[in-house]
Amino acid sequence: MNRPLFVSLDGPKGTGKTTLLEAVTQVLRAGNQKVIRLCERKSDPFRGETMALVNTLARNPCRDLEWAVCQRLADSRRWISQNVLTKQPLDSIILIDRWYPSDAAFRQTIPFAEILQLNMERDVRVPDLHVGVVTDPDISWARAANRSRGLGGTVIQKHAEHVACTEMFEQAVKDHGWMLCRNEGTVEEATMLVVSRIHEVLGLNVEVDARLGAQGIA
């Protein structure tokens, strides 16, 4: 490829997405792949202002405010696309923790089709592989509750809302043909699925051992 392979991992809260991303990174690096790990939130220089707007939206839910949040996020992704993604080594694999697919879970009044169009109009880079990480909502809710930071969400506060956002996200995965990764078993199982798909996109014939790394590149 003449540019890095760009892979996004998205999903509702508590699905083990960040842990999975770390495990995928480890396995790919064990197979001598150059991996760049990014986080949308940490790469966004405007996140403080956006989160202030998200907090306002949480207190006063309305479509206009939510659309403003969507616009700010799309503008930030355009900035990341132009100023961060383009600076990575051409022979690398970029794994990013959240990108525009996450809006399918967290936006409540704006149809995702409109959000997707907005991001495309902003020239946000389209991932070469979208990975949607999901679990049964009861499992992810319990996982989130057991974390030190809890659910850690501003938009989603109630179990019923979490169930609804999980259902919306899974529907978006189906509608757009993204990779669905059910992370209800071991992290090794989910890691093997994701790494195997990345190798498939790269056109590599690789035997994957999620514990030992990638072996046998053809």
What function would you assign to each model-found segment?
Residues 103-168:
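A glycine- and Lys/Arg-enriched "phosphate-lid" helix/loop adjacent to the NTP-binding pocket
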Residues 17:
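Conserved lysine of the Walker
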Residues 40-114:
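ATP-dependent small-molecule kinase phosphotransfer cores
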Residues 20:
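Hydrophobic positions on the alpha1 helix immediately C-terminal to the Walker A/P-loop
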Residues 12:
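P-loop (Walker A) phosphate-binding loop of NTP-binding proteins
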Residues 26-36:
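Post-Walker A helix-loop "phosphate-sensing" segment adjacent to the P-loop in P-loop NTPases
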Residues 9:
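Hydrophobic anchor at the beta1->P-loop junction of P-loop NTPases
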Residues 129-130, 134-135, 154-157, 175-190:
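Phosphate-binding beta-loop-alpha motif at adenosine-nucleotide cofactor sites
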